Amino acid sequence: MSLTLVLNGQTRTFATLSQPSSLDCLIAELALKGDRIAVEHNGEIVPRAEWPQTTLTEGDRLEVVHFVGGGTLF
């Protein structure tokens, strides 16, 4: 059992995920902290509260963006 997804433009197979899996499971598999990322699933931004109910299926397209602090102080 595995799940193949297009993640940030690259096709990746996740051997530990099966179909269907939740977006929450993928975020855990990637070891990402949910408070500093945004996720787009098949062209739609997914609010964090909906990650556990968002079902991933074979071939889904995801974009995961990390927020980074920075800048200068004047």
Q: Where are the predicted features?
A:
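Ubiquitin-like/PB1-type beta-grasp interaction modules and other compact soluble beta-rich domains
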Residues: M1-F74
